[in-house]
Amino acid sequence: MIRKIIYVTGTRADYGLMREVLKRLHQSEDIDLSICVTGMHLDALYGNTVNEIKADQFSICGIIPVDLANAQHSSMAKAIGHELLGFTEVFESETPDVVLLLGDRGEMLAAAIAAIHLNIPVVHLHGGERSGTVDEMVRHAISKLSHYHFVATEASKQRLIRMGEKEETIFQVGAPGLDEIMQYKTSTRDVFNQRYGFDPDKKICLLIYHPVVQEVDSIKIQFQSVIQAALATNLQIICLEPNSDTGGHLIREVIQEYIDHPDVRIIKHLHRPEFIDCLANSDVMLGNSSSGIIEAASFNLNVVNVGSRQNLRERSDNVIDVDVTYDAILTGLREALNKPKIKYSNCYGDGKTSERCYQLLKTIPLHSQILNKCNAY
């Protein structure tokens, strides 16, 4: 019997991480996959990345626009409310067998709430992880609203068990974002330098810095410290614009001050293959993106992880954690650039997550008893 699955996506990040899983499901005769699109995908400020989903020829079963222009804290809460209404309508119309979610963003929480009230089983990827920010609370809330958990690490599995999730509903599959990394043939350094107009004699830094909503009052000072430290280290910088969380507009204001700097390339959005190319060809990664924690080790790329956003996440040996001060960031960058290039073991998996997810999604029990969820103790 064919299973109908809806994946919810709200950002370039979650879609990029899940792309190989979605492709594997799309190729299957056992799965009828469609995608419900919301959030940053539908905003020109973030690259109208819904067009990537269309280009990949996935079926889109719903589009739920939200207002991301308002930079207030309340805008995130209001967006979740709008998305809850939208997901309810889409799920009620489409009647999927499973709603598939990833991570810790508000749109995933809204989708989980809608699904459980419509008696639709929820499968959650990347549950059980810690970060130490508001994202962690949302992630754990989604886990408690989910019926199955596809986790990246053993520690995440054990954390979910301690949270009261039943062990038989938890499967360690690895991080889905690693699959495409293992398959993609990256550009040579010469081609990469030509693409971005870089001096081949200078080193390259991939910079991604997202806002932490509890620290929005200091976010401009934080980002100035980050980019100034990178420039003081004589690095050429590929700077990706931040996400839509509260405070992102303040980071973009600072980024615009460097738009004419000869060593800075400001990028609104990178397609997934281009982003993988950046990971492969950079000499150091700087900022607070989860890609530095999860994906960079697969490229043996040293990472200077700044501040609290990924504070409690598991990390491989390539990550150097520093405070959000100019001196600490400068010291971290020098350490990262002076470390020998070695092969790191990535604690988040082996790049075979897509097949594991497919095998599970076509076989996990979906009987009505699975919906009657209660704590294991």
From Swiss-Prot:
CDD domains in the record: GTB_UDP-GlcNAc_2-Epimerase (cd03786)
MF (Gene Ontology): hydrolase activity, hydrolyzing O-glycosyl compounds; UDP-N,N'-diacetylbacillosamine 2-epimerase activity
Coiled-coil stretches: none
Keywords noted in UniProt: Hydrolase, Virulence
A biological process term (GO) from this entry: carbohydrate biosynthetic process
Class in the EC hierarchy, top level: hydrolase
Pfam families: Epimerase_2 (PF02350)
Keyword Hydrolase: yes
Reaction catalysed by this enzyme: UDP-N,N'-diacetylbacillosamine + H2O = 2,4-diacetamido-2,4,6-trideoxy-alpha-D-mannopyranose + UDP + H(+)
EC number: 3.2.1.184
Function: Involved in biosynthesis of legionaminic acid (5,7-diamino-3,5,7,9-tetradeoxy-D-glycero-D-galacto-non-2-ulosonic acid)(Leg), a sialic acid-like derivative that is incorporated into virulence-associated cell surface glycoconjugates such as lipopolysaccharide (LPS) which could be a key determinant in the ability of L.pneumophila to inhibit the fusion of phagosomes with lysosomes. LPS contains a majority alpha2,4-linked homomer of legionaminic acid. Catalyzes the conversion of UDP-N,N'-diacetylbacillosamine (Bac2Ac4Ac) into 2,4-diacetamido-2,4,6-trideoxymannose and UDP.
Membership in a protein family: Belongs to the UDP-N-acetylglucosamine 2-epimerase family.
Designated name of the protein: UDP-N,N'-diacetylbacillosamine 2-epimerase (hydrolyzing)
Source species of the chain: Legionella pneumophila subsp. pneumophila (strain Philadelphia 1 / ATCC 33152 / DSM 7513)
